[in-house]
């Protein structure tokens, strides 16, 4: 409307005419009779149809009012509206923002046609990878020691040995002298390209493993059959045969002579002995198998606890997906050629708004960047096709300088070798009940370690430039933020404000279909140009995306190779940043609409973003529908679509949820949610369903505790597993929802009961000692009470730090009201008269640290630990305990000497031992 002549679209009708009124989204009648003193309530679809009539009437030419009125009457034969009334409503739509700007632009584009093609995105994309240009690292001229020379020869002999096999994880740290010799040898080995440097890293790691005595992983990865098991099974078969022979002999049907070992026995006696021998061998096999499995799971837990947790969660299903269907399914997603709508009006406006942004400074990768990035990466995460763990990048410091130079060379060239961005995607079954269908597998991509290093550095450089442009609503990336917890705090603040002030609040949850797999590469390149990312990085990333490909694997078997032509990787630091940059313009567009919910302190919140999880806020049904349509238009133009079955809308009037018919979209309908909806894992309705959340978290926590206690982990590892596997279920909602003290105490008591049921805790042992650290003589368990208190305190501290600069968190702090509840300082277990007696007795005569080292190093079962600690705490059922604690006995004196009380100290003292020995003799 801004391009039309102002005198032809009056701001309001003449005084004698009835003025139109908007009533988008409100109940209305369908009649169009206008009488003096009445108003017509326009539907959203009618407003859209009216704008279509307006733009199709060519409003820049004379006589457009008659043409618009004629088109309106053709569509609505029974309408009695006059041309001036239609023009007034058009003006009303713009002035009162009855439709969002994106909806108006979409209608305008639809009526005017595509017009002139939009400009092409400058991607600086080369059609194919260029030959790798080399950078020769300077060679050290220092004289090598004999050990370094020997290592150099071994490394040179292993370079370019194919195929690569997975490298083993180290169970101990190599000596400093060995690593110094290896780094000295590396300085004397020249490499020209990053490919050669990668070969050098792999060869060096292989040689180090060989020197340390690790066996190569060549050959089959199948589990070897233990020799002891083979021998025992052979003995069991022989014993079964003997039992069968004895049974036949007892019936008189055996023609062969008796086995030699039973020749001097009667047949019934020999049969009984054979059966007992068979039972003993079977029990031995069962015991050995159980003990061997216990050793295996404890070794695995010591190095890869996540694998143990995955097994407990049922993610070890070995069913292979169908090869052909899986290949077709993922190629249909990733190899789909997709592009964004470069002619969208909102994008044209966005380009104009961003035309004067300064370009990012030139990027140079330094040795300090390499060291900083490597220090923040995990040592033993699953490697990509290069089979190199991050640990070796940390230890082989001699290659850092050449890596930095060779990465800079790649940036200048604008491309890289194809292997650098190749990945291997492991397909893991989601729900075993759905079977081996391709859509029931979750893809986990492992990328080359060198690429993860380089992409992480590039992501850090881009983040530094984008920090001034990224929306505050996006908390999926960024530093110094609590991420999902921050979004939940904001959401909790809005919901509580609505309930307390009885205001109107409309919310909507938006979910994308295959969000990470559907964002076009052209849109990513467009956004990098939009925010004026350094042109060298733009060219490199654009060319890199053309080379993305991965090999699908299931249960260690390769299925197919797929090119990533649409979507992003989910295995490096750069891809999430690119995805968030691709959604960042949506925040700017939503903010421009002016819609949102106004808090008590005047702060306005219109939307929240956590990666692809979007939540919209508005004060009226009309406004929330406009935000939904705005988001839909944006998503459609960039090539992404809603997953309507997971989207939802909720309308709250005066603090109470009401039912409406939802909102209609071209793809379908977004239904209203009345009961609950999970946002970032927290159930929601009119605010938070706190009781339901607490119940669900507690039930899942106790279920995981049972899984841990049923396992064959040693006592120390069970405590670690409960702390790191079960307690996070409680920690996540803590600080967001209130947790009554009674429920916290009940959950801790339930945990202690489960420990007692599985033999890991004596019924009358000290619960305080259960939660003390193992260095101090405790069991190292963390209580639910301490977990909730710790997380709540951290959240409160975070709110206080951010409140001065964040108006929403400032209101959240005002709602919080009460200060942190500090843990009550009660007596420690050492001060208890009975439980702390042993500790007090040895404090003066023994080294406490060494006295409790067995709790950390012995590797005992939890039942054994519980028994030893119960004895130290006087918790065994002696006569003194029965008389003084249980009150089931009157005489606490020792049953042997009849003099001193029968305590644990008395039983183990020299007098008790002497009395016992005298009686037994």
What are these regions (language model features)?
Residues 667-741, 759, 794-809:
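Basic, alpha-helical interaction scaffolds
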Residues 352-585, 907-911, 916:
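Conserved pre-catalytic core of RNA-dependent polymerases
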Residues 132-248, 698-705:
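Surface polyanion/phosphate-binding segment centered on an Asp-His-Pro turn
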Residues 731, 773-774, 782-783, 821-901:
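Helix/loop segments that flank and initiate small ligand/metal-binding modules
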Residues 8, 12-13, 556, 628, ...:
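Short, conserved micro-motifs composed of acidic
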Residues 40-41, 56-103:
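Trihelical helix-turn-helix/Myb-like DNA-binding core that engages the DNA major groove
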Residues 133-142, 241, 248-439, 449-453, ...:
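Surface-exposed loop/turn segments and immediately adjacent short secondary-structure elements
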Residues 201, 330, 384, 422-425, ...:
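Catalytic palm active-site di-aspartate
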